[in-house]
C-alpha cells in the first residue's frame, strides 16, 4: 500500500516545519560606537582574563549566565572605559557597548547588533538614555530604575542585567587594577 498525500498537505507540513528566521540588524560597528560614546578620545585595548571567581561575582550581581569575554575592553587616557558585551535576548544574542566615565558612571550605551524578530525598540535612544549616570551602586533592574518596553520585555531585562554586569566588572576589576610590583 502506497501513501499518496495531497500536495496541499505536503505544502502545509513544509510551512509548519520552517523555522522562524530572525533578521540580523547591525546598527553600529565597534569603531562607530566608540566615536559616539567616547568622542575625540584615543582608546587603548585592555584585554583581561576573567577569572572564574570574577565571572561568578558578575553572574551573582547580574543573573547573566553567558560568560563575559574579556577581550573587548578599551580604556582612554583620561580613565574612561569602552566595553562590548553580549546577552541573550529572547532566543538570540544582542551585542551592545557601554561607555563608562573614569569614576564608573555610565556615559551611554549603544546597541551594536540585534538578531531577534521582536524587541528592536531597545535600540531607541529614549530607552537607552535611562542608563546614563548609573553605576554599580544602582539597581539597574527592569521595572525598578529601568523602564520596560512592551513587546521587548526579555530584551530589556537582559540588556539591563548585562549593563549591571559591566558596571560590576568596573567596580571589581577595572576601578583599581592589580599592579604588579617590580622587584
Locations of the language-model features?
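N-terminal signal peptide c-region/cleavage motif recognized by signal peptidases
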Residues: 17-19
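Flexible, solvent-exposed loop/hinge segments and secondary-structure transition points
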Residues: 22-146, 153-157, 161-183
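Bacterial N-terminal signal peptides that target proteins for export
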Residues: 1-9
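Cleavable N-terminal signal peptides
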Residues: 11-12, 22
Amino acid at each position: 500500500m502506497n501513501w499518496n498525500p495531497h500536495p496541499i498537505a505536503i505544502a502545509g507540513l513544509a510551512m509548519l516545519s520552517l523555522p522562524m528566521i530572525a533578521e540580523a540588524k547591525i546598527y553600529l560597528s565597534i569603531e562607530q560606537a566608540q566615536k559616539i560614546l567616547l568622542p575625540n578620545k584615543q582608546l587603548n585595548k585592555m584585554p583581561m582574563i576573567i577569572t572564574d571567581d570574577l565571572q561568578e561575582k558578575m553572574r551573582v550581581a547580574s543573573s547573566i549566565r553567558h560568560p563575559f569575554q574579556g577581550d573587548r575592553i578599551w580604556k582612554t587616557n583620561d580613565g574612561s572605559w569602552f566595553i562590548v558585551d553580549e546577552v541573550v535576548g529572547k532566543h538570540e544574542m544582542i551585542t551592545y557597548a557601554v561607555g563608562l566615565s573614569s569614576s564608573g558612571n555610565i556615559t551611554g550605551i549603544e546597541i551594536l547588533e540585534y538578531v531577534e524578530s521582536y524587541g528592536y525598540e531597545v535600540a531607541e535612544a529614549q530607552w537607552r538614555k535611562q542608563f546614563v549616570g548609573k553605576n554599580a551602586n544602582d539597581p539597574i533592574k527592569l521595572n525598578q530604575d529601568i523602564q520596560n518596553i512592551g513587546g521587548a520585555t526579555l530584551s530589556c531585562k537582559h540588556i539591563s542585567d548585562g549593563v549591571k554586569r559591566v558596571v560590576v566588572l568596573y567596580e571589581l576589576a577595572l576601578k583599581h587594577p592589580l599592579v604588579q610590583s617590580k622587584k
